[in-house]
Amino acid sequence: MKAVDLFCGCGGMSLGFQNAGVEVLAAFDNWEPAINIYKDNFTHSVIDCDLNDSDAVAKIKAYNPNIIIGGPPCQDFSIAGSRNMGERANLTIRFAEIVSEVKPTWFVMENVYNIERMPILPKAKCIFKKAGYGLTVRILNASHCGVPQTRRRFFMIGLLDAKDDFLGRALDLALLETPMTVQDYFRDCVGEPLDTTFYYMHPRSYNRRGVFSVDEPSATIRGVNRPIPQGYKKHHGDKADPSKGGVRELTTKERSYIQTFPIDFRLEGIKTDVEQAIGNAVPVKLAEFVAARITDYSRR
């Protein structure tokens, strides 16, 4: 199976599919910091390209992929509300248009879990259905897919001339019964435990907790990484009180591990850009989980 990755970022989706045995032929993005990280970690081409450009489809067709994968940027509905989604929503439609024109056998579209509440999704589905794709749709909790993180993400998997929900049972049966914890992942996959029992992750708002235990999955890794603010007031859900010590923020590398990037994955660049690239990425093992179900199905 040969793939092209659209909106590839720093390469989480690409690496997950590679790990499942898919050959990634090329990747496309137009954010330079992420492209530079991608180049440092993959041998195939990554093309700096605005996928709205008129020649984008021809560039993708040249690789003759039988699967297109990608996570078109789409602002979280909880942030955007009912406002016009604008350019980011258009990228979801653009992804659907590209797939319908290139016509690979398969496609995988990843997005924010609450895209199902956005008016853009029915429009994208309509494009895929008109192109002849059967669709499997799932909201996957990454912690049940081998990722130590309660990140919920939307996946739409398309296969030409298939019935809808063709892959649903395979996805459901493969989910882990017990969520992956930070402690278990660091011990089993990183090779050494995290040197703290409690850590701080800057919450989206102070209505949410910021202190977590290694004996649970982390919250969603976002594109910001800040130290514990002076005078931080303990949230009722915090697993420890930072004012009493024993709590620290995670390093950039540790955050990449929670996104299930491997130890040898290179992360060079301005710190804020690297943090953003890590937070934007599809967790490697989440992508690998989906890819493995696809490769198993395709061998039938």
Language-model region placement:
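S-adenosyl-L-methionine-dependent DNA methyltransferase catalytic core
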Residues: 1-24, 127-131, 153-300
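Short, conserved SAM-binding/catalytic segment
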Residues: 38-46
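Class I S-adenosyl-L-methionine
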Residues: 54-65, 72-220, 224
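Hydrophobic anchor residue in the Rossmann-like NAD(P) cofactor-binding loop of oxidoreductases
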Residues: 51
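The conserved SAM/SAH-binding core of class I Rossmann-like methyltransferase domains
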Residues: 27-28
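Short amphipathic alpha-helical segments
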Residues: 18, 39-40, 80-82, 120-122, ...
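Conserved SAM/SAH-binding beta-strand->alpha-helix loop
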Residues: 31
